[in-house]
C-alpha cells in the first residue's frame, strides 16, 4: 500500500493573488513597473501581472524565474560550486532547459513547513530590485 500524506499544503488562488498584490504594492512604492508571476509547486502559472510601463521583454523572464524556483525547490541565482559562481554551469542550465532554468535572481520559493508550495518571479528591474519586490510577495505569504 502506498503511503500518502493527508496534510499536503497547496497554494490557493487567493494565496497567489495576495502574493501578487503585495509584490505589486512594493514595485509601486519603488516606482518600478514590473512583471510578476506566481506559480504552484509544479511551476504552473496561477497569477500574473504586467504593471503599466513594465518591459514586455521581461514577461517570460518573470514566469521562468518563478517556474525555476518552484521546480528546482530553491531561489533563482547563478550556479555555485562552493562559494564560487560557475558561469558555465549557469549558462548550461539556462540553455539546456530552453530558459526554464535561470541563473538570474528574482525567483523565490513560497514554503509551508519547509515544503515548497509555489514561487514568485519578478522581472523588469535590476536583479536587486526584482528580488526586493519578490521578497515583499513572500513576506505577505508568510504573514497570511
Over which residues does each language-model region extend?
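Flexible, solvent-exposed loop/hinge segments and secondary-structure transition points
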Residues: 1-144
Amino acid at each position: 500500500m502506498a503511503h500518502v500524506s493527508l496534510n499536503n499544503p497547496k497554494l490557493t488562488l487567493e494565496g497567489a493573488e495576495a502574493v501578487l498584490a503585495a509584490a505589486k504594492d512594493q514595485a509601486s512604492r519603488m516606482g518600478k513597473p514590473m512583471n510578476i508571476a506566481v506559480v504552484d509547486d509544479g511551476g504552473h502559472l496561477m497569477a500574473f501581472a504586467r504593471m503599466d510601463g513594465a518591459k514586455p521583454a521581461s514577461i517570460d523572464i518573470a514566469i521562468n524565474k518563478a517556474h525555476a524556483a518552484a521546480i528546482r525547490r530553491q531561489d533563482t541565482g547563478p550556479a555555485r560550486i562552493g562559494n564560487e559562481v560557475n558561469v558555465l554551469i549557469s549558462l548550461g542550465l539556462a540553455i539546456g532547459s530552453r530558459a526554464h532554468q535561470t541563473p538570474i535572481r528574482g525567483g523565490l520559493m513560497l514554503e509551508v513547513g519547509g515544503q515548497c508550495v509555489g514561487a514568485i518571479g519578478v522581472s523588469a528591474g535590476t536583479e536587486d530590485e526584482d528580488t526586493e519586490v519578490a521578497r515583499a510577495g513572500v513576506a505577505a505569504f508568510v504573514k497570511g
